[in-house]
Amino acid sequence: MFCVIYRSARREQTYLYVEKKDDFSRVPEELLAGFGQPIMTMMLPLDGRKKLANADLEKVKQALKDQGYYLQLPPPPENLLKQHLESIGKK
């Protein structure tokens, strides 16, 4: 199984995985409108892989099979104040 990964022109660290190059037929129009112009980043074989950098491999495969796409959102921002308060509260 191969996938093609596109990055969003509008949102940093947001990626869209699809099964075939330039085939967005199964991606909802609303999602594409918010995503902006997809910029192809890479083609990737999923078979034989053990993991992906920032996405769960099994979730990606299942989403591609079930809905035809997988949307990778950026990680939540670090809350350094919360981390600091928790660290001094534990001491």
UniProtKB/Swiss-Prot annotation:
Under the heading InterPro entries, the entry gives: YcgL-like_sf, YcgL_dom
The record ties this protein, via PROSITE patterns, to:
YCGL (PS51648)
One short Pfam name that applies is: YcgL
Residue ranges of domain YcgL in the record:
1-85
Q: What is this protein called?
A: YcgL domain-containing protein ESA_01460
